[in-house]
Amino acid sequence: CALPIFNNIIPMPKDLLIEASTSGEFGMQYIIAQQRKPFNSQDDLKVIQWMEIQEEKVREEALQLGMTYLRNWGKYGYPTWYEWSIANWGTKWNAFNQNFEEPNVLWFDTAWEGVPLLIQTLSEIFPDVEFQYAYADEDLGSNVGKGTIRNGETDMTFPDNGSNEA
């Protein structure tokens, strides 16, 4: 059962739950490039060229998605769920493979790495609870950390990759 754990701590705006795609990114960049004419950069010209060789349906979809990305960027600072979740949760997806093996202990997986800032936010929501937090990458010996967090105050250690502590 996948519970939206991270979304309950730091809720993602629903408007951001849209497709994150290269064509949407190109649509957004194309709209921006059109506003800069005639002072386009080389990157602008590549995007313009890409848009001009697309079939009309693909071009229209890219432009529509690009407009939505720009609206979201202006409103939330991020075009889609992808950029927002990395910035706010520290990873691209919500927690998965959640497991409550014992009282007050939660195990979960993330897409990339630990989420100490998310746990810090949780500790600010519950200031009287001390969180003991540890994480490890599936690549043993790298990207590990552990410590305690209470009322937003963190005491974490991050061993060097490849060290005996890792």
What are these regions (language model features)?
Residues 7-166:
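Charged interaction segments
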